[in-house]
Regions:
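Multi-pass alpha-helical transmembrane bundle typical of ion/small-solute transporters
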Residues: 2-176
């Protein structure tokens, strides 16, 4: 297996002007993608569109960012898996809490679910990172790859759970 030769973003640790510019570009790319995802989610809710499929599709935006920056998806695998497991499982108690106890239940379900799923997903993230390293694949820990990898995983995991919930008849309609 060839080592990953994708660009690295070491942030400001090297102190060089080149690293600072590269880090600024990565930060701007992340910010643009994050704002686009947030605006698309708001747009979806305003129009009462099915949330699950839209969130699932929004997972493509951060993947696009990784590809534009020539980041290896294999290097982002631990973050993708972490995000998918973490937020995919988190949606379950948040959804249940919201349907059962309203907004407060959704918040409590989300907070408790997040605490539990961070630990569960962390086991998988660490195991996958170790597996990749043993095979000579650099599972990059630069800020852009990690942030966009986790964002992708979170959107795909949550979107998939919401789509499955809707197939079981769970409706996610606003009651304003």
């Amino acid at each position: 297996v060839k080592p990953d030769n994708s660009p690295k973003d070491e942030g400001y640790s090297g102190g060089s002007h080149e690293h600072a510019i590269f880090s600024l570009r990565s930060t701007l790319l992340f910010a643009v993608i994050a704002v686009a995802v947030a605006l698309a989610a708001i747009h979806t809710l305003q129009r009462n569109w099915p949330v699950g499929p839209v969130i699932l599709l929004l997972g493509g935006l951060p993947i696009f960012g990784l590809l534009v920056q020539r980041r290896s998806l294999r290097s982002a695998a631990p973050d993708l898996i972490f995000g998918a497991i973490d937020t995919g499982l988190l949606v379950i108690p948040a959804l249940w809490g919201g349907l059962t106890f309203g907004v407060a239940g959704a918040i409590a379900g989300g907070v408790v679910g997040d605490a539990l799923t961070d630990g569960i997903a962390g086991f998988f993230e660490g195991a996958i990172a170790r597996w990749l390293r043993k095979r000579g694949i650099d599972e990059s820990r630069d800020p852009l790859t990690t942030s966009l990898g986790k964002m992708t995983g979170c959107l795909v995991g949550a979107g998939a759970v919401l789509v499955i919930a809707s197939l079981f008849g769970v409706t996610l309609r606003q009651s304003l």
